[in-house]
A protein has these predicted regions:
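Short, flexible hinge/linker loops that cap or flank conserved catalytic cores
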Residues: 1-3, 26, 85
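A secondary-structure boundary/capping signal
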Residues: 11, 36-37, 50, 87-89
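Glycine-rich FAD pyrophosphate-binding loop
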Residues: 25-47
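Dinucleotide-binding Rossmann-like beta1-alpha1 core, especially the glycine-rich loop
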Residues: 51-107
């Protein structure tokens, strides 16, 4: 049954929309609806085209912790026993000495 009203309506079931709904319900909100234009995992937004890359190395300790928490959350999500997130790796290449020093600070 489709609801015709809700306290919170989130447009888009991408990472931002789903995360917003997740945390609102975790905080006790019960009247939250997520609206998506197409079938889940086949949506037209940027999340469905993203490779699953989350950089956990950052010069900012807060952003590094946020990335780690994101990976922990994404890793825990599943749909009927199937994972919803497939992590991939990445590499950053320093082409200059300044960039090398910047990368060293991030580690």
């Amino acid at each position: 049954m489709i609801q015709d009203k809700a306290m919170v309506v989130i447009i888009g079931a991408g990472i931002v929309g789903c995360t917003t709904a997740y945390y609102l319900t975790k905080m006790g909100w019960r009247d939250v609806v997520v609206v998506e234009q197409g079938p889940l995992f086949e949506t037209g937004g940027s999340t469905s085209h993203a490779p699953g890359l989350v950089f956990q190395v950052n010069a900012s300790k807060i952003l590094a912790e946020f990335a780690k928490d994101s990976v922990d959350l994404y890793s825990s999500l599943d749909l009927d026993g199937q994972p919803c997130w497939y992590p991939v790796g990445g590499i950053e290449v320093a082409w200059t000495q300044d960039r090398l020093e910047d990368l060293k600070r991030k580690v």
